[in-house]
Curated annotation (Swiss-Prot):
It is found in: Plastid, Chloroplast. Keywords: Chloroplast, mRNA processing, Plastid, RNA-binding, tRNA processing. GO terms for molecular function: RNA binding. Usually encoded in the trnK tRNA gene intron. Probably assists in splicing its own and other chloroplast group II introns. This is Maturase K. The gene is matK. It comes from Iris tenax (Oregon iris). The keyword Plastid applies. InterPro entries: Domain_X, Maturase_MatK, Maturase_MatK_N. GO terms for biological process: mRNA processing; RNA splicing; tRNA processing. The lineage of its organism: Eukaryota, Viridiplantae, Streptophyta, Embryophyta, Tracheophyta.
Amino acid sequence: MEELQGYLEKDRSRQQPFLYPLLFQEYIYALAHNRGLKGSLFYEPTEVFGYDSKSSLALVKRLIIRIYQQNDFLSVVNDSNKNRFVSHHRDNFCYSHFYSQMISEGFAILVEIPFSPRLVSYFEKKEIPKSHNLRSIHSIFPFLEDKLLHLNYVSDILIPHPIHMEILVQILQCWIQDVPLLHFLRFFLHKYHNWNSFLITPKKSIFVFSKENKRLFRFLYNSYVSECEFLLVFLRKQSSYLRLTSFGFFLERRHFYVKIERLQMQHLILIVVCRDFFQGTLWSFKDPFMHYVRCQGKAVLASKGTHLLMKKWKYNFVNLWQYYFNFWYQSYRIHINQLSNYSFYFLGYLSSLLKNSSTVRNQMLENSFLIDTVTNKLETLVPVIFLIGSLXKVQFCTVSGHPISKPIWADLSDSEIIERFGRMCRNLSHYHSGSSKKQGLYRIKYILRLSCARTLARKHKSTGRTFLRRLGSGLLEEFFTEEEQVLSLILPKKIPFTFYGSHKERIWYLDIIRINDLVNHS
């Protein structure tokens, strides 16, 4: 038990109780506004954060004054007579959508401070490892290609959202022990929920909050997901055949500043959970070939074990969410499939095992015989239907894939329109360069190219065919030249580019740190 307690010991280095006073500083909101205009650290578009020209220093000062005026509420939030705090006046600062957006973004900046690599390195007197900048999303696929070829079963897991925001606040208490800040967060979420309860049902409340306060919800959600992974790491470590002293796990942590390699448990309460719900079944998880990969809310669990073993892991996930996080999750939502007959969607690719059979003739003296061999290969394909659906959502084409103009871009200059469409094509080529077959990607590029021509034609009141003839190869170079130049440096000169590099060669890049926007829309 002492060893387990040491494994689950809290990390005190990140519990800095100095964040709440920063909520009353103007530069915090200026920083949040600047992040919103330029996109987040992960290069998200401006419209994600909902910032516009209405933000100003005067409004920030007015917000801080109102927070001061409402500050006396924080000391009595837990009072039994809560009805007196429920005001339905739209002018209340917590009910104002604009002010709540500012508070949400300012709070998101504050809670991210303890996880800044610069701050952590300052307190720990360590330099920031340069390898953190080299971790690419594409690095997951060579790992899958190396490991999945020898496994039997795979399970798609969609990590559910908690049904109540209070669960997320309780989890955050173990990461940041700034009591006033946590009280303010609880107060803010309570008021936000009461205001939206008149407009939406309680079941959709957390969904609406995640859409309107993406940055704050993303941090709270990642704290919750990390709890699931901490317990998963503990179970996997307990069930491992080899108890190495240097045993460690690497979990790809998206939307976190720090991607932790050697994890420590954050809650001593996990001891009780493990003892009460998992102690009697740990013996059944003796499987050295278990692999877990997650990005955002989608996880893949693969194993070389039996179907019964995968079912036991499945029900332990369900028990974890039911008994530890206190919300019901139906077991049928976790699908277990035989890897040889299944294609799973992960990180914008459809991945499956492709069996390649070959026959070798063996000659020994006067005798000869044939040897049939079967090898597995991980095939990664571009999900054309999903991408067309994403293009339809952002109005580049119809649901059936017919290109249309982009009216919202018609007011831009011609060069800006071409540059935007070209950048989208280059980003798609860059992200889906690991596809086994490129024909589907070429179809998406064709849709974008025609959409670009029709957007220009709409601006100049002409036809798309006219602009295609006018621009000719110039438009084609804007969409394809960069990819061709990159591949020409990598592939052998003797092999024709149009056949070998375009259709067969898979290339994984080491500089992709975020999922393509079209993949996120699908």
